[in-house]
Amino acid sequence: MCGIVGFVNYKQDVSRFRNILINMNNTLVRRGPDEDGYYIRKHIALAHKRLIVIDPEGGKQPMVESCSKSIPLQKENSDMVINYNSNFVISYNGQIYNTDELRKTLEENGFTFNGHCDTEILLKSYIFYGKNVVKHLNGIYAFAIWDSQKEELFMARDHFGVKPLFYTMQSNSFIFASEIKAIFQYPGVEKILDSQGISELFGIGPAHTPGTTIFNNIFELKPAHYAIFNRYGLHIEKYWSLKSLPHEENFNQTCEHLEYLLKDSITRQLVSDVPLCTFLSGGLY
C-alpha cells in the first residue's frame, strides 16, 4: 500500500508551494512508511509515499521518463510527422499483475528497462498506449501521470476501485490524493459535510453513490474510469464495464476453468522482493 498526492494549477507557479505538498504527503505516512519522493515544476506538484514491495532501488517515485518520438500528422494525403519530446512523470499506488506480458510487448517495440518494478512498466506502457493503457492492465491501481509537453495530467483507477483516489477543485487548482485528509492540507479546502453523503453513510454505509463522498465538492474517481485534466478543464471517461455473458461451459469445464483462474490470480499476486504473508478466510473447499 502506497500513497499519492498532487495538484495542478495553470495560473500560478506551484513550485513555490513545496511545503504544502510535503504537508499533504505527510498525512499518508501509514500508507508508505519506507520512502517518500517529490516532483515539483511550474504547474505540477506530485508526491509519493512508498511501501517497498518490488525493486527497492529501481522503484523510487515519482518516476520520470524522457521520451522522444515522431507522431504521424493526422491529415489526409500527408506524410508529415510531429517530433514529440516530453518528460512523463508518474506517482502510482497499486500492483500490476500482467507485467511480464506488458514488458514483452514494450521490448518488442524498442523499449528498454532500468529495473524490474511495475512502476517503470506502467509508465512506459502509458507512453506506448496513451490513454488506452487502461485497456491493457490487469491489477489494482490508482495513478497520476504528467505529460510535460502537453502540460496534461492523466489519472486512472482500477476496474473495481480497490485503490482509492479523490480529487477537488480549489481556486484554479486541481488537487488529488489517495485519502481525503491529504486534500484538506491544501489551503482553502474546507471540511463541509454533504447532507446526501451523510444520509448514505448512516442509511446504506459503507455503500455510497459512486463518485461521491461525505464532503462537499470532494469526489472520488469512480472505479474503471480515467480522468484527463488540462487547460481546457477536466474530462472523465469510463473505460470498462462488467458484461453479462451466457455461460456455455459444462460443470467439469467450469471447475477446471475456475481452478485455473484462481491459481493464476494467486501466482500473479505473490510477486515480491520482500517477505510476504496472507490472511485466509473460509469459502474454498
Predicted regions and their residues:
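Cysteine-centered catalytic environments shared across enzyme families
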Residues: M1-Y285
